[in-house]
Each structure stands twice: as C-alpha cells, then as structure tokens.
Amino acid sequence: RTHLFACGIKRKSIKWICRENSEKITVCVPDRKIQLCVANFLNSRLETMEKFKEIFLISVNTEAKLLYNKNEGKDPSIFCNELRNSFSDFRSSFIGDDMDFGGNTDRVKGYINTKFSDYYKEKNVEKLNNIKKEWWEKNKANLWNHMIVNHKGNISKECAIIPAEEPQINLWIKEWNENFLMEKKRLFLNIKDKCVENKKYEACFGGCRLPCSSYTSFMKKSKTQMEVLTNLYKKKNSGVDKNNFLNDLFKKNNKNDLDDFFKNEKEYDDLCDCR
C-alpha cells in the first residue's frame, strides 16, 4: 500500500505539455508520461541489482493500478492504450532515449545510470547503454506480466501481448491523435448541444459563445502541438521513407496533410460562424 503513495493519483484530464529543452528544441509530452510512476526508484537506495529489479516490478505494477483507477473501468480500450504506452515509456526512461526531460525524468535517468555503472563496474557510456538494453531484453517479459497481472480480466488477449518496440516519437504521435479525436468529439458535441438553435452569424452571443470559442482554442493549440511532434519525427527520421508514417496517419483520419487535419467541418461553420 505504501508504494501507491510514492506515485500520485493520476490526473484525468487530457493534456500535452510543450517545453523547450536544453538544445532549444521544443518537445510536447503527454501528461500521462509526466505522471509515470518512477518515484519509487528515487525512494530506494537500489543497493543491488536484485533490489533494482524489485523496485522496477513494483513501479510497473503500481502504474497499472493507478491507470486503472483513473479509467474507473469505463473504457477498456483507453486503459489498454495507456498501459502499453506507459510500458514503452518505462523502457525509454530506463534505456535513456526518453524525449521527456526535467524533474524526476532526469533524476531517475541519472540515478539508474549511476547504479548500473556500480553494478557492472562500467564507466563507458556506450557500453553501459548496451548493458541496459540487454537487461531490458532479458527482463521485459517479466516486467510486462507484472504490469498486467491484476488486470488480465480487464483487457483483451490482444492487449495482453507484450508491446512491440517502436520509437517513442511514433507512439506519442499515435497517442496524440487518439487524445485529439476524443477531445475534439467532446467539444463538438457540446457545440451541437448549445448551438443547435443558433442562427447564422449569431454564434458569438448567448450560450453558444463559450463552446465555439473553446473548440477554436483547442484546434489552434492542437495544431501547434502536432507541428512540434511532426517536426520531432522528421528530425529523428531523415531517410527516404520519413513521411510514410505521417502519411499513413493522415490517411487513417481521411486527411491529406497537416493543414487538412485542422480544417473546420461544415457543421462547425454552420453552428459557430459569427463574422
């Protein structure tokens, strides 16, 4: 029970935090990742490799419990996605290729590196990274099973399969897309509820004003976030096929490109046009 208090109750709002790192590169991070349960690492001396593994198992198990409590068992697909995304982010945090920075993220990264350097009597950074990657490959199945062990009745057999390794930026773009579509739908349903009696060009008045402005602000902020994420993707993928992943994402949403992604639907214009 005490281990749950080492990590806070999950915030339920969908949010992305965009910040500039030390290299002057802006990174947008899902709030889910910012809340990843890594505090137990910092609350332990991690004297031995066995203790490190014990704390890692506790952390993934606690993360799953907190995500389940956040979801309240309402949507298995959302719970599944968050489980799998958090597991992948545990890997990135451990391996050292996490795009998130600051706070516990940097402290945990440095602490784990120090401990693994002690465990293996190795100071060379490249060799140390290879050691961590080998350790992950050896232990990932056990970590994943420990993460889902109490929730196998709440997820599908497909969801229970250990997540395949995929670049963090790809996973975050997919997660952003899922978050975007959910929030867009919620805000648009509010417009339809509040503005159904609205007459053309009068949306800026009465109860229709706030839903329309909230939707507009959300779309503007979301476009900035997606531009940041796609720029990060292109920086990390310089090959000939660098746009394939993004193009597939646009096609999945029946869009042609980034600009098309954020065009207002005709129904929005009909309900919220207040020129």
Set out the residue ranges of the language-model regions.
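Intrinsically disordered, low-complexity segments
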Residues: 1-275
